[in-house]
Amino acid sequence: MTIAIGQEKTRGGFDLVDDWLKRDRFVFVGWSGLLLFPCAYLAVGGWLTGTTFVTSWYTHGLASSYLEGCNFLTAAVSTPANSMGHSLLFLWGPEAQGDFTRWCQIGGLWAFIALHGSFGLIGFCLRQFEIARLVGLRPYNAIAFSGPIAVFVSVFLMYPLGQASWFFAPSLGVAAIFRFLLFLQGFHNWTLNPFHMMGVAGILGGALLCAIHGATVQNTLFEDGDAADTFRAFTPTQSEETYSMVTANRFWSQIFGVAFSNKRWLHFFMLFVPVTGLWTSAFGIVGLALNLRAYDFVSQELRAAEDPEFETFYTKIILXDEGIRSWMAAQDQPHENFIFPEEVLPRGNAL
């Protein structure tokens, strides 16, 4: 008989921390939580602080806080002043020099929230990877969440990095985002951009697929219990299906002539459509950061300029964009002292 005497492996500090982070608790922490929770807390806290107390008078010439009379829809944390360029605006940096009030006045809170928000979203994505790995799931949730991350990073970081300063990013508020949308339309003709079209198709297509899928499952639920309502007619741990894929397939085959043949392809398509839409719109925003143009139908513009009776929906959009630029540039960038002579302002359909 052979007796093997082994020495118990000593556990290092890393193993102890790993065990504590992955302990089963009400709110899982994990290694990703070390990035997610502090960044999310600071980003949300910074936004609540900014919308409550901090003015945009010094950066945009606007009132933007509850303290100044704004409400939830009009309050915002505004982007830094154009003169700040692409500085990270550290509180201890040369701009604020440790003065918290000055830091808020020049837009330091926006940079603080945008950067911590970006890392918070990345932390949330990593959290989905980590938990999926621990419980033995595929990582498609995390892959899908890369879409919102791509849009956030492209809009709040990549776009202003391609422009003159952080000033041209969206301020963090509801009405502020609407103003940014008008800006993108007026200066980039964004709605006519094919990447925007693909993004809209992806998001609205995903919503349509979600509605169809939910309704179809509800329509084909089995009556496999004696409970009073549908939701109590099955148990979450039962091995049998609770709805009929065959019935759903026959129904949509009659409606459209085609239908998904299996659940894997169906659910992959529901994943693919909206995530692809988000990614394509993010690519489009990066293109706008580089001032790339899309779909300039110059022949129609030239003919409209020569013939007062010729007008298309495209030339009407171009006129509207000119109006947005001429009104918004002076309003939105008062520090530039823009003055537009009468002859460059849009009039009729004469471009």
Curated annotation (Swiss-Prot):
CC cofactor note: The D1/D2 heterodimer binds P680, chlorophylls that are the primary electron donor of PSII, and subsequent electron acceptors. It shares a non-heme iron and each subunit binds pheophytin, quinone, additional chlorophylls, carotenoids and lipids. There is also a Cl(-1) ion associated with D1 and D2, which is required for oxygen evolution. The PSII complex binds additional chlorophylls, carotenoids and specific lipids.
Positions that bind pheophytin a: Q128, N141
Binding residues annotated for chlorophyll a ChlzD2, in chain numbering: H116
GO cellular component terms, A-Z: chloroplast thylakoid membrane; photosystem II
Misc. remarks from the entry: 2 of the reaction center chlorophylls (ChlD1 and ChlD2) are entirely coordinated by water.
Protein name, per record: Photosystem II D2 protein
GO molecular function: chlorophyll binding; electron transporter, transferring electrons within the cyclic electron transport pathway of photosynthesis activity; iron ion binding; oxidoreductase activity
UniProt cross-references to SUPFAM superfamilies, sorted A to Z: Bacterial photosystem II reaction centre, L and M subunits (SSF81483)
Family from the record: Belongs to the reaction center PufL/M/PsbA/D family.
One GO process term, biological-process aspect: photosynthetic electron transport in photosystem II
Species whose genome carries this gene: Pyropia yezoensis (Susabi-nori)
Residues the entry annotates as binding chlorophyll a PD2: H196
Membrane-spanning parts: 39-59, 123-139, 151-164, 206-226, 277-293
One Pfam family cited in the UniProt record for this chain: Photo_RC
Gene assigned in the entry: psbD
Keywords: Chlorophyll, Chloroplast, Chromophore, Electron transport, Iron, Magnesium, Membrane, Metal-binding, Oxidoreductase, Photosynthesis, Photosystem II, Plastid, Thylakoid, Transmembrane, Transmembrane helix, Transport
Residues that, per the record, bind Fe cation: H213, H267
